[in-house]
Amino acid sequence: KPNPAEAIGLDESYSRRKSYDHWSPNGVLVKNLYFHAEGRLSFSSPDDGSASAFDSFVSDPDNPVPFSAEIRTTQGHAWMVEDQRFAARRPDVLVYESEPLEQEVLIAGPIIASLQVSTTGSDADWIVKLIDVYPPDAPDNSPRGKQVRMGGYQMLLAGEVLRSKFRSSYEEPKPMVPDEVTQIDFDLRDKYHRFLKGHK
């Protein structure tokens, strides 16, 4: 009897499964994505001259960013793929998008987001999301009989929250030094997802 696969990935774009003897799959290339000016996201690293560039926002604890566009007491069944445009429109949310993809991109394995951040206070909550942005002409979808406009849909793939003081340890919280740039790493967990051509 053959050994079971170490991992089975579901490629929802083509409704097919693929078995892998090793995870992360052998042959996967480790690629970095970089923030650029004007909300751009690219596989190319920024020029040296932009190393000191930064984006900023004002966070109001009395007006936090909700996890859902709907008012609900539970997460519901669809929150992990909910359209994120409700958050992207807010002035206290930074959004970075790639150009429309010229070819498909399959991600398979762990995702780490490494941020250089500072705050005027001694603590802050940081939220990082990985989103698949559909093209404007994407056909509509009708899950469970409900019509969903998919043009420009921002499908949530991963999202993690981290309070600054727990960036190194939950057992020994460490406050931020106001206005001092500090590195914070987010583990967005392993993902298996195909970004189709034309998506961002």
Give the label of every model feature segment.
Residues 1-200:
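C-terminal, loop-rich substrate-recognition/catalytic regions characterized by aromatic stacking residues
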